[in-house]
Design a protein with these regions (language model features):
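Active-site and NAD+-binding cores of ADP-ribose-processing enzymes
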Residues: 12, 38-132
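Long, hydrophobic N-terminal alpha-helical segment
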Residues: 1-41
């Protein structure tokens, strides 16, 4: 899992977390800020989270100043690591650092309810070449 190999905004290296965006448009923005050239080999995967799976939420007002900084600061990685370690939920929503009014879904693969989350078949995704 890529996020555990390198770490991310919400997890330090060695802590597995699956990142998902609430919409395809947000996923596109999140990918575009990571790459200097348009990626060619991406797919979109819809995720179904059953109603019985607890989803915790962290709002922008819950976060410390500078949480959006790039590169990411260790404080957000600590928050994510604590969430994984405590194991209260399989899913945590957090604001996107690009568009804080939109949500990123963090999935904890080590949580017992993770197996209830369904990943639907992926579809190829082509970035519009006008996005540069």
């Amino acid at each position: 899992m890529g996020s555990s190999l390198h770490g991310g905004r919400w997890n330090p290296k060695g802590v597995a977390v699956v990142y998902a965006a609430a919409s395809a448009s947000l996923a596109t923005l999140e990918i575009l800020v990571q790459y200097s050239a348009l990626p060619r080999d991406f797919v979109l995967t819809e995720i179904h989270i059953p109603s019985g799976v607890l989803i915790q939420s962290m709002n922008e007002r819950d976060l410390p100043p500078g949480w959006q900084a790039f590169p990411q600061r260790s404080i957000t990685q600590e928050l994510g690591h604590n969430w994984v370690s405590q194991g209260h939920s399989a899913v945590l929503t957090v604001p996107s650092s690009i568009l804080p009014s939109e949500q990123i879904y963090l999935l904890n693969p080590s949580h017992h309810a993770f197996e209830k989350i369904r990943f639907l078949p992926s579809t190829p995704f082509r970035f519009d070449p006008r996005l540069k």
